[in-house]
Amino acid sequence: MAAITASMVAELRAKTDAPMMECKKALTEADGDLAKAEELLRVKLGNKASKAASRVTAEGVVASFVGGNAGALVELNCETDFVAKNDDFLAFSKTVAELVATQNPADVAALSALPLDGSTVDAVRLALIGKIGENVSIRRFVRFETANKIATYLHGARIGVIVEYTGADEQVGKDVAMHIAAMKPVALSSADVPAELIETERRVAEQKAAESGKPAEIVAKMVDGSVQKYLKEVSLLNQTFVKNDKQTIEQMLKAANAAVQKFALFVVGEGIEKRQDDFAAEVAAQVAAAKQQ
């Protein structure tokens, strides 16, 4: 059997980006034949990628990019917070954000088909899955194109905001974006709050008010009051400015002769149900699988 040297492992790793141990295993299996080892490794990575691609991705990052008159916010998911800090994963996230801003894809499918590094975005994604051993997915993106100004804010890499605004002071845009990340409004104004959210809040308020035992007309006023309070709490313009509790966002903007046209807020994993592993069941499944082999 041919001796497997460190330089051979390094050369194979440079060609495939595979982990060192995987490279050594492939070279051993190929009896030192570099070309054969590369082929074996690509097959293994392909299998690894296809298996990983079915797993739940509830961790990840939000990335942003602003260039010219366009800006983008994207969410990419992985399986663990460890991989969410991986340099290759972070670099891919930033590249995807730039592609969204500059290429204006219609949806995630169109984005995935865009050319990248002599291949496509999706091919690069699959190669990344093979390299890091976890599923990686592009979940969503939003793109603003405007003659107005665009501001973005990232809180760590888990919360991202993009804002379209007008006004001479760029600090206003930064402040509004930071406020949105902290207070998480669901709409620009009370009139923009989705009807389904209002109905849910009204039902909750009705149930609480009904338990008070007060007359129907009082209950109706209590419900209306609760709904109005909710609308103020979740609409950006009505929220109290986090940097000055004496002002609402609307008042702050007016004082700065500025206005917000729209915004988007992404929180990593929002709405994704994380997989809760049953350790005992997992061990039992592994034992059963081993017996079948």
UniProtKB/Swiss-Prot annotation:
One Pfam assignment: EF_TS
Entry's Gene Ontology cellular component terms: cytoplasm
Subcellular location(s) per record: Cytoplasm
Start and end residues of each stretch annotated as Involved in Mg(2+) ion dislocation from EF-Tu: 80-83
Single GO MF annotation: translation elongation factor activity
Entry-linked SUPFAM superfamilies: Elongation factor Ts (EF-Ts), dimerisation domain, UBA-like
Keyword vocabulary terms for this entry: Cytoplasm, Elongation factor, Protein biosynthesis
Source organism superkingdom: Bacteria
Record CDD domains: UBA_EF-Ts (cd14275)
PANTHER family assigned to the protein according to its UniProt record, in alphabetical order: ELONGATION FACTOR TS (PTHR11741), ELONGATION FACTOR TS, MITOCHONDRIAL (PTHR11741:SF0)
Similarity remark: Belongs to the EF-Ts family.
Function: Associates with the EF-Tu.GDP complex and induces the exchange of GDP to GTP. It remains bound to the aminoacyl-tRNA.EF-Tu.GTP complex up to the GTP hydrolysis stage on the ribosome.
Record-given protein name: Elongation factor Ts
Organism: Burkholderia cenocepacia (strain ATCC BAA-245 / DSM 16553 / LMG 16656 / NCTC 13227 / J2315 / CF5610) (Burkholderia cepacia (strain J2315))
Encoding gene, per UniProt annotation: tsf
